[in-house]
């Protein structure tokens, strides 16, 4: 009962405020337009079979991967303890909902990982069984090596050849974060294994984010569109061109963050209407023919001021995006 009261105290004020602020529209949009389609089928090309999140968990939880077998074995062995029951009731129902939902994205079950960390911490209360140690060592080593190979693969496909040192460093750290803790774990040095996994794992993720990721230019489509608009003096926050920007064929939240919350993510007809109104438009190649046909009906000329090509990694599709403005205008004024 007290748990329900606490939840109501935390969620209630926010739920009431958002209901009043949107006149109930938030719930209609969130449940009817967003949640329901995700439960009914794989939405926006993000469908996957059950087992998808389970397969990704060792990779997304790395370097905690080392202790996942111990956490699961300990959870079953001590399921009668109140703290363990709490963590299980936190993890299992939530994870199963995400696993059984047709629409899946890797980050959906991340809130459940804290429960896994809770169970992993509980495993330190007693010596680990040989099964937990060897399973953790093997799983951690395997995932570390796969992530190391993944760094090299990403860099080979999308990276800058001059960043080979950064890729080598990140890959080496991921491999070390898997292999060194596994060696300690096999020698029953659980504390040393955990310290090595945490230390090297943090350094590996830091190297990936700070040194490797910035060089993966083809994956940074939204950031490159923002830069191209700024160069052409069409970026809304510059206050030169009419706003907002209309976008057809590329509807990613990262672009809204880059260009502003008023950015219009619609189709070719709406992008053409933006040009007619003197606003810039971004059009993906698949929508270009319809875009130009709509402009021809209005008798309006258009010119392409920049083009950005890359990979929409959220869908796995290559994209080619043209930035357009009305013909005859030399800048965004």
Task: Specify the residue positions occupied by each region the protein language model found.
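Transmembrane-lumen/periplasm boundary regions of multi-pass, lipid-linked membrane glycan transferases
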Residues: 1-107, 112-126, 131-167
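Alpha-helix capping/termination and helix-coil
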Residues: 115, 119, 128, 187-188, ...
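Active-site beta-alpha connecting loops in nucleotide-dependent enzymes
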Residues: 135-139, 169, 216-222
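Internal/C-terminal transmembrane anchor helices
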Residues: 144-146, 174-215
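Hydrophobic alpha-helical transmembrane segments
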Residues: 165-170, 195-197
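Short periplasmic/luminal acceptor-recognition loop of GT-C membrane glycosyltransferases, typified by
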Residues: 195-320
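Core SAM-dependent methyltransferase catalytic element
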Residues: 315-332
């Amino acid at each position: 009962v007290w748990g329900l009261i606490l939840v109501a105290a935390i969620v209630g004020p926010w739920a009431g405020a958002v209901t009043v602020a949107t006149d109930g529209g938030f719930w209609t949009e969130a449940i009817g337009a967003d949640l329901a389609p995700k439960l009914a089928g794989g939405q926006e090309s993000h469908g996957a079979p059950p087992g998808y999140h389970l397969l990704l968990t060792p990779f997304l939880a790395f370097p905690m991967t080392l202790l996942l077998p111990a956490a699961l074995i300990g959870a079953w062995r001590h399921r009668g303890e109140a703290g363990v029951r709490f963590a299980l009731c936190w993890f299992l129902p939530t994870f199963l909902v995400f696993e059984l939902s047709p629409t899946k994205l890797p980050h959906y079950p991340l809130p459940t990982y804290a429960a896994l960390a809770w169970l992993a911490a509980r495993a330190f209360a007693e010596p680990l069984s040989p099964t937990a140690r060897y399973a953790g060592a093997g799983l951690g080593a395997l995932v570390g090596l796969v992530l190391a190979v993944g760094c090299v693969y990403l860099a080979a496909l999308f990276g800058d050849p001059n960043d080979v040192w950064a890729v080598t460093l990140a890959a080496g750290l991921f491999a070390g974060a898997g292999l060194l803790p596994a060696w300690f774990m096999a020698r029953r040095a659980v504390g040393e294994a955990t310290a090595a996994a945490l230390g090297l794992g943090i350094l590996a993720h830091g190297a990936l984010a700070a040194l490797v990721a910035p060089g993966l230019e083809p994956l940074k489509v939204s950031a490159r569109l923002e830069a191209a608009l700024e160069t052409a003096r069409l970026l809304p926050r510059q206050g030169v061109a009419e706003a907002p920007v209309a976008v057809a064929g590329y509807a990613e939240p990262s672009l809204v963050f880059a260009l502003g919350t008023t950015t219009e993510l619609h189709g070719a007809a709406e992008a053409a209407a933006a040009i007619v109104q003197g606003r810039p438009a971004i059009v993906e190649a698949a929508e270009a023919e319809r875009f130009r046909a709509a402009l021809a009906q209005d008798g309006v000329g258009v010119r392409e001021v920049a083009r950005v090509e890359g990979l929409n990694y959220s869908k796995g599709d290559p994209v080619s995006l043209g930035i357009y403005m009305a013909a005859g205008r030399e800048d965004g004024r």
